[in-house]
Curated annotation (Swiss-Prot):
Disulfide bonds join C57-C94, C62-C117. The chain crosses the membrane at residues 31-51. It comes from Xenopus tropicalis. Among the many cysteines in the lumenal domain, most are probably involved in disulfide bonds. It is found in: Endoplasmic reticulum membrane. The gene is dipk1b. This is Divergent protein kinase domain 1B. PANTHER family: DIVERGENT PROTEIN KINASE DOMAIN 1B (PTHR21093:SF3), DIVERGENT PROTEIN KINASE DOMAIN 1C-RELATED (PTHR21093).
């Protein structure tokens, strides 16, 4: 014990000479206070981290809610048996950013997956996370018992029309949804199967996954149970391959962020391939099979790629249909353009005279994509390409106004940029 006291005395007081201590008698108290403050701050950080984790990560609540409703026969799905009976759908690392939207990495059928489910209604009903689930009273109330197959088809058609607009291909999408709902492949859709697919469709990401299912740049939907769903895991969930930890992002200045990103980013030819994939995705959603879609969070954190450096959208919840945005803007009061913003950056103009938002987004998807690609592609780019690449990206970033009114110009810029990049990496191992 005496040795321990000596060690503490040496650590706290030896850096200060005895002469200085005699001149500054309060220095010992200051050192003790600093030591106590360090312990207090460290304990507070640990406590806050634990509290934040326990608040955000409620995978056990998610499983409890879903499995309770599955065992009652209220819901169904292709992943229910593995989740609730055999427990081969395993929750692993918590990735949630909101307590009402649970996101976990996991493992299912010998592959890495992402598991997502919502617990909002349960938390609203009772602050105790272990209380009996009552969410089926709110979420799984449609269709009601006695609804015929034709009536359910009509429900689906009207829902898709309201969210995707008048599209000639909606009938095919309804058939695709009914096939997905028929989990046991008996050619019929039970009430539990219908309730599950109806709840699932009300999740923006699922609606977009089904609408963009034929596109190679979105995550594949692997299974569901009620409104819990499982998607493929994207190996690299950031444009730069890795992300700076959250607690460091606020501490480090933006120039340091840029240096870290450049250091972690793939080689330039691989970045060019990823960029081509992003441009192809922008092209696909510009006037797709099921209407137009808008990227409403153009952060590099929402763009990833797989082992082959093929572009992948990390989170389709950040993408919105044209009908969704128009519904948000319709009749909306505004004082300035920022009042007309859906998501992070889908902004329409504010009519200052009428004090209402206009219906059309100012900045098209392509301009947002080019803003992301400017730093991403120019750093380390081949010298014989840099000047022309910079020129085309600058032109691309100036795109604005109603995209449908400048479709030819939009397509020309996109194709020129794709061609420029593809010529540089074609006939190489990177292509």
């Amino acid at each position: 014990m005496r040795k321990l006291r000596r060690l503490v005395h040496m650590v706290l007081f030896c850096p200060i000479s005895k002469g200085l201590q005699s001149r500054l008698p309060g220095i010992k108290v200051k050192y003790l206070f600093l030591a106590w403050l360090s312990v207090f701050v460290g304990s507070w950080v640990v406590y806050m981290h634990y509290s934040s984790y326990s608040e955000l990560c409620r995978g056990h609540v998610c499983r409890m809610i879903i499995c309770d409703q599955y065992k009652k026969g209220i819901i169904s799905g292709s992943a229910c048996k593995d989740l609730c009976d055999e427990r081969t759908l395993v929750f692993q690392q918590c990735l949630s950013s909101s307590p009402t939207q649970q996101v976990y990495s996991g493992r299912w059928r010998d592959r890495e997956v992402i598991i997502k489910c919502g617990v909002e209604e349960t938390l609203k009903a009772d602050s105790n996370p272990d209380s009996p689930p009552r969410r089926e009273l709110v979420l799984f109330d449609k269709p009601t018992r006695g609804t015929s197959m034709d009536e359910f088809k009509e429900m689906l058609g009207n829902f898709l029309k309201a969210n995707l607009g008048e599209q000639v291909s909606l009938t095919a999408l309804v058939s695709q949804i009914l096939t997905m709902a028929d989990v046991n492949n008996d050619g019929k859709v039970s009430l539990a199967e219908a309730k599950s697919i109806w709840a699932l469709l009300h999740l923006n990401e699922i609606l977009l996954m089904l609408s963009l299912r034929e596109k190679e740049h979105t995550s594949q939907l692997l299974g569901h149970c009620g409104d819990l769903y499982v998607t493929e895991k994207i190996p690299h969930d950031s444009l730069y391959g890795s992300q700076i930890p959250g607690f460091l992002q606020t501490l480090l200045p933006s120039p340091v962020h840029r240096l870290v990103h450049q250091w972690c980013a793939p080689a330039w030819p691989r970045r060019a391939k990823i960029a081509i994939g992003l441009l192809e995705f922008v092209e696909e959603i510009f006037h797709g099979t099921y209407g137009s879609f808008f990227i409403c969070d153009s952060s590099f954190k929402n763009i990833g790629y797989n082992e082959k450096y093929d572009f992948k959208v990390v989170d389709l919840r950040k993408v919105a249909t044209e009908m969704t945005i128009r519904g948000f803007l319709k009749g909306r009061h505004c004082e300035q353009n920022s009042d007309c913003t859906f998501g992070s950056d889908c902004t329409a103009a504010c009519d200052k005279l009428m004090k209402q938002c206009r219906n059309d987004v100012i900045q098209p998807n392509l301009a947002k994509a080019c803003q992301l690609l400017q730093d991403y592609l120019l750093y380390g780019s081949p010298s014989d390409l840099r000047e022309e690449l910079q020129k085309q990206l600058r032109t691309c970033m100036t795109l604005s106004g109603l995209a449908s009114q400048m479709e030819v110009h939009h397509s020309l810029i996109l194709n020129n940029l794709k061609t420029l990049l593809w010529k540089k990496i074609s006939n190489t191992k990177y292509s």
